């Protein structure tokens, strides 16, 4: 019988077959799946008050060869975007800053400057720009739209709360650009959206991370989101958004600067922004 995928699923499936001591170990693992990636069998035995043999037997009943295989599964879950701790740095802020810096440096090394300029030019001269983001990609898309709308008009963010997407994609023309932000843990419909855009006359600019396989798009740029914490980091995607928006503004020359000035004046007239 094939064991269920995650550690918690395996525990739930095997719970009634476990003895009292084994349930003590399994209960600890179920309550602290993040920590489970940190401990070997001896440490788990110490923390649960059972023997090392009991810990080993528990893992076997859960379908693992041993504690290391369970830790490997947790690391794989983290690679799929699930929040699982894989290390325990003494200085979490320093560890995260180091990881973020590495992700941004990777972005700088791997981004095709000519392609970025071409994509930025297309965004600058498009009739309208539609910025599309799902789940964790939505706040990144929102920040991109916020930057672009200060540089040029007719920039829409979709889907808004309560919206469906179909009506937003109808009527796109060859002089429109759709910017899609698709980061790890994308919705199941994500590939369908890209295929629909591939058949549309508009052009598609995809901002993704390396976990996404080959996809149809006129331009694609990847930003790593690996993290020192249990959750993905968006330092590199946000750096990519900033670089893209900056190139768009630069490509608009005087028109972009004039719009920025007009937006700034509107903020002042409305008293919307503080210092």
Language model features: what each stretch is:
Residues 1-9, 270-275:
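Short, low-complexity, intrinsically disordered N-terminal peptides in bacterial proteins
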Residues 78, 248-252:
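Conserved NTP-handling cores and scaffolds of large molecular machines
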Residues 124-240, 245-249:
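Glycine-rich phosphate-binding loops that contact phosphosugars or nucleotide phosphates
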């Amino acid at each position: 019988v094939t064991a269920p995928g995650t550690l918690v699923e395996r525990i739930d499936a095997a719970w009634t077959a476990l003895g009292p001591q084994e349930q003590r170990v399994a209960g600890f693992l179920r309550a602290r799946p993040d920590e489970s990636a940190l401990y070997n069998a001896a440490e788990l035995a110490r923390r649960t008050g059972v023997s090392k043999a009991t810990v080993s037997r528990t893992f076997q009943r859960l379908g693992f060869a041993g504690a290391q295989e369970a830790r490997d599964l947790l690391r794989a879950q983290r690679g799929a975007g699930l929040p699982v701790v894989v290390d325990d740095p003494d200085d979490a802020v320093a560890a995260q800053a180091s990881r973020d810096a590495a992700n941004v440096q990777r972005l700088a090394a791997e981004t095709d400057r000519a392609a970025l300029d071409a994509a930025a030019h297309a965004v600058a001269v498009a009739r309208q720009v539609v910025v599309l983001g799902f789940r964790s990609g939505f706040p990144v898309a929102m920040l991109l739209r916020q930057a672009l709308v200060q540089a040029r008009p007719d920039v829409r963010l979709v889907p808004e709360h309560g919206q469906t997407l179909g009506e937003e994609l109808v009527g796109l023309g060859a002089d429109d650009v759709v910017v899609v932000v698709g980061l790890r843990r994308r919705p199941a419909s994500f590939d369908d959206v890209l295929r629909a855009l591939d058949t549309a006359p508009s052009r598609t600019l995809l901002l993704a991370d390396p976990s996404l396989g080959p996809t149809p798009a006129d331009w694609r740029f990847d930003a790593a989101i690996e993290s020192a914490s249990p959750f993905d980091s968006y330092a590199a995607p946000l750096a990519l958004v900033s670089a893209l928006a900056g190139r768009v503004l630069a490509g608009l020359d005087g028109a972009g600067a004039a719009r920025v000035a007009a937006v700034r004046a509107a903020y002042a007239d409305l008293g919307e922004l503080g210092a």
